[in-house]
Amino acid sequence: MSSSLWLQCLQRLQEELPAAEFSMWVRPLQAELNDNTLTLFAPNRFVLDWVRDKYLNNINRLLMEFSGNDVPNLRFEVGSRPVVAPKPAPVRTAADVAAESSAPAQLAQRKPIHKTWDDDSAAADITHRSNVNPKHKFNNFVEGKSNQLGLAAARQVSDNPGAAYNPLFLYGGTGLGKTHLLHAVGNAIVDNNPNAKVVYMHSERFVQDMVKALQNNAIEEFKRYYRSVDALLIDDIQFFANKERSQEEFFHTFNALLEGNQQIILTSDRYPKEISGVEDRLKSRFGWGLTVAIEPPELETRVAILMKKAEDHQIHLPDEVAFFIAKRLRSNVRELEGALNRVIANANFTGRPITIDFVREALRDLLALQEKLVTIDNIQKTVAEYYKIKVADLLSKRRSRSVARPRQLAMALAKELTNHSLPEIGDAFGGRDHTTVLHACRKIEQLREESHDIKEDYSNLIRTLSS
């Protein structure tokens, strides 16, 4: 009964939850029904706490729906479902004994999955270098709605490298925290296991190492090195585009690492299938584990980032100043940090207190550029071009989905990227009421949670408008 009951719950949860959430949190759960108690086993404490906090009501509701009057008690445990005792071993024949006698010789011929790297080899200029930045850890990564899923996945991978989500593929625009998460995973893996061999690198470094190995006739050493790591963290995988020899070598490295249960984490500025110049067989493999989008931070996260960075610099940043900066600089974390560094430097040089007027003066060129780039008119033109419709359609009364959805997206973008009020936005979209704009913003926020396509479109448009 446990398998059928939990299977029914799983099927419904898969329909109700976004695909990425279901794959990350619910699918790994194992179930056992015993004495009218359904025990759900989570792979680790982090998953257990998350499921109990976020999905307990959903699970209880479905248990009541599918169990009728005999609703089982629900409990959670960390671990795996107990394994059923094996059947008694069959009687062995003489042929079985003869076959077993040859097994040790066969095993002796097998090579270990984790190969060793000969550090004394002079054939190739490759030595173990982790390149993991010790400054980038989970405890100084600012969590928000835009990166929550990516952070949770990274934490799970660091707790169970090679087992949870392999490969993990993080994608999103420049300066959103993907590289920070790569380093944080690397640091956490080494903290948990000081002997772990973790390597972080930009994809171009992989290409450089391969070229150098070919020049030095040391390609076998190159292969042994990259296939012996416990975790390979590669940034900006899109730079493999049109490098056929590098793609060929990485394809075989990828397969070897996965076969050996060694962790792979990749980042890119776009969704795997949208990376041009990369072979389909590689793009397909990029999606074998878990693919998570890292989106531009929302206002609250931008404020939290500024406050955290100011605290790191031992600088008091008034709340109203943090909100002033965060409302005007929206594209990425790197831009926020750069702006704050400029404000702090100006304050140190002049000895003046950090106020809104002071920030407006210190960042006047940057703020002027942002206000010039992102206007409602610019948003309308960009959205219309993206969806291959006319700006006049966005301003019209047409309600067909092919027009209504882009219009709602454009309104949501105007609220996110400009300082205009809801009535002003409504007026710019054909004289619509502010409640229409509010409904559009809420609808798009909901769809970004439920629809990968809408989430992707929204991220692409923000990236275009902020570039």
Curated annotation (Swiss-Prot):
Subcellular location as annotated: Cytoplasm
Disulfide-bond pairs as recorded: none
Primary location class: cytoplasm
GO terms, molecular function: ATP binding; ATP hydrolysis activity; DNA replication origin binding; lipid binding
Region (Domain II) residue spans: 87-130
PROSITE patterns the UniProt entry points to: DNAA
Family in the record: Belongs to the DnaA family.
Known partners and oligomeric status: Oligomerizes as a right-handed, spiral filament on DNA at oriC.
Function: Plays an essential role in the initiation and regulation of chromosomal replication. ATP-DnaA binds to the origin of replication (oriC) to initiate formation of the DNA replication initiation complex once per cell cycle. Binds the DnaA box (a 9 base pair repeat at the origin) and separates the double-stranded (ds)DNA. Forms a right-handed helical filament on oriC DNA; dsDNA binds to the exterior of the filament while single-stranded (ss)DNA is stabiized in the filament's interior.
Domain notes per entry: Domain I is involved in oligomerization and binding regulators, domain II is flexibile and of varying length in different bacteria, domain III forms the AAA+ region, while domain IV binds dsDNA.
Protein name in the entry: Chromosomal replication initiator protein DnaA
Source organism of this protein record: Vibrio cholerae serotype O1 (strain ATCC 39315 / El Tor Inaba N16961)
